[in-house]
């Protein structure tokens, strides 16, 4: 994951707050996240932090979520641990996980703009949690519009209501899934599950390019080798 981020030209002044999600017990990835942030911010001399005294360590957070399924775990108990992982990912996306810091004042939304993942079962939980949030906000906006249209049908009151109504919360929750480098001709189980749901599905081998969950769905994108 971090080798991918090093190849990408990300502007830390645009992505002002970053959250790294690791599974429980994965201390190596947590340490790599801190190392990556330290190196990245050193290479960004133009980055300016808010005037309220926030520093580089407050512009990112490393959050640990339960594993969806541990090695050799029984399939009978796997659904329960998967639900625990899903709920933890849901809290992370809402900015309410106990290990998360308060986002910087410059952020416009409690939700992330982009979600980049290449993990196994945790990636499935994260992407599905993001899709659930987007569906919730979509349905909420539909019911809000219908409710107010039923209450008042006069044009004048509609204009007044549109002027008084608060601006909608800005959120993106765009998901990008990167298939494992080890998958050359077939998808992993996580890849098969996320193929219909991820906004962008990147593969690292040409044999997997242009695949679809079913006809009419978006195709997978060949991005070349993304790992060192």
UniProtKB/Swiss-Prot annotation:
Residues 1-74 are lumenal. Residues 94-228 are cytoplasmic. Its main location: endoplasmic reticulum. Keywords: Endoplasmic reticulum, Membrane, Nucleus, Transmembrane, Transmembrane helix. The keyword Ribosomal protein does not apply. It is a single-pass membrane protein. GO terms for biological process: dolichol-linked oligosaccharide biosynthetic process. The chain crosses the membrane at residues 75-93. InterPro entries: Oligosacch_biosynth_Alg14. One of its GO terms (cellular component) is UDP-N-acetylglucosamine transferase complex. The keyword Transmembrane applies. It comes from the Eukaryota. Pfam families: Alg14 (PF08660). It is found in: Endoplasmic reticulum membrane; Nucleus membrane. Belongs to the ALG14 family. Involved in protein N-glycosylation. Essential for the second step of the dolichol-linked oligosaccharide pathway. Anchors the catalytic subunit alg13 to the ER. Heterodimer with alg13 to form a functional enzyme. This is UDP-N-acetylglucosamine transferase subunit alg14.
